[in-house]
Regions:
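Metal-cofactor-dependent catalytic cores
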Residues: 2-182
Length: 182
């Protein structure tokens, strides 16, 4: 029996004593199965709103204020302390727009990762290097995408904007760090 078959059988057996339906439990457990580990490909910060992002190799991450040196540092809600986008989504957007490549600076996100579906981290905590983050929402595109990416940039980014996160445990994030569900 495959590992997934064993998991599903255990869930089915455990449900004999629970009020949850089999399908609800299976879905809940499937949402926790994220064996992929991603990798940090790019990091950018900006000290002022609408300023161009500065590319860095590493950044200190603080629990109360987010990324050191980023303009969202100390924002009131803390829900957008860190923004992340998938390299695979940048590739999709560049294809939609007929471009060879999109410079991550133009998307105004802090961290570009590859190898993991960021949307699968919704409602979960995850680790990048020694930093623990928690997803707080979907990062929707703003009107600057039209200016930064050209005609159709806003619509090309819809569904590909990444996620927002808050800091649970501080530390440092650097290029090449692993990103994984915890």
């Amino acid at each position: 029996m495959s590992w997934l078959g064993k998991v599903l059988q255990k869930i089915k057996d455990d449900n004999k004593f629970m009020n949850m339906s089999y399908n609800e439990t299976v879905l809940k457990d499937l949402l926790r199965i994220i064996p992929q580990k991603g990798k940090v490909e790019w990091i950018g910060i900006r000290s002022k709103k609408k300023e161009e992002l500065s590319v860095v190799e590493s950044v200190k991450v603080e629990k109360e204020t987010g990324l050191e040196g980023d303009h969202f540092k100390g924002s009131s809600s803390g829900k957008r302390q860190v923004t992340l986008i998938q390299q695979e989504h940048l590739n999709a957007v560049s294809s939609i727009l007929g471009k060879k490549r999109i410079d991550p600076k133009l998307t105004r996100r802090n961290i570009v990762v590859s190898g993991i579906n960021l949307l699968s981290l919704k409602h979960h905590q995850f680790r990048i290097g020694d930093v623990t983050l928690e997803t707080t929402g979907i990062c929707t595109p703003c009107s600057l995408m039209e200016e930064n990416l050209g005609a159709g940039g806003y619509n090309a980014m819809r569904g590909h904007g990444g996620i927002t996160a808050t800091v649970i445990e501080e530390g440092k994030i650097k290029l090449g760090d692993t990103i994984e569900l915890i």
